[in-house]
Regions:
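C-terminal "post-core" interaction segments
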Residues: 1-178
């Protein structure tokens, strides 16, 4: 599987703001060596755009995999859910992820100190479009699970993880049919 169709930054350097970025010089050096300007005018991380992950053939798990999701599933975990969705033997159970299905911002997220107020903020430098992003909604959704299992008042009151319970029930049902 692949993670990204496109992974790019709008700039190859943080100049003239380097002094306001924690480790700004190192960030500039990193951007210089890991990005390349493409015809679209953006600076791409080509290595990660081309990277294909393949299953290991030795000592690998051959059973079914259930991935639990909910609103706080975002950033790298949303990327993971997108990459796993539709893979043989993988089922996403729970709620829509909080992270974007179409893409995310991140990869390098430097600390920036605003010069007058000294407020510290973090701003992602890269835009990542998920692999096969043309097959998912462009705006407004996270990764949709294969099996929806939302919260319930009763589960909250009794401190029951109803997503985990649903998966346990599915596994037991499958095992009893074998």
């Amino acid at each position: 599987f692949k993670v990204a169709d496109s992974l790019y930054s709008v700039a190859k350097s943080m100049a003239p703001y380097t002094n306001h970025i924690k480790n700004g010089l190192l960030t500039n050096i990193e951007l210089f060596f890991i990005t390349k300007k493409y015809k679209d005018g953006y600076f791409h991380l080509g290595h990660l755009e081309r990277k294909t992950f393949k299953p290991k053939t030795k000592n690998n798990f051959k059973g079914k995999v259930y991935i639990l999701t909910n609103g706080p599933t975002f950033s790298a975990s949303a990327l993971f859910c997108n990459a796993m969705k539709g893979q043989p033997g993988v089922t996403l159970v729970g709620e829509e992820t909080g992270g974007g299905w179409y893409g995310n911002n991140g990869i390098i997220i430097p600390d920036i100190v605003l010069p007058n107020t000294k407020i510290r903020v973090r701003l992602p430098l890269f835009r990542l479009l998920q692999f096969e992003h043309d097959k998912v909604p462009q705006k407004g959704t996270g990764v949709i699970p294969d099996i929806y299992c939302g919260p319930s008042l009763d589960a909250l009151i009794h401190k029951v993880d109803n997503k985990m319970e649903a998966v346990i029930k599915m596994i037991r049902s499958e095992n009893s049919q074998q």
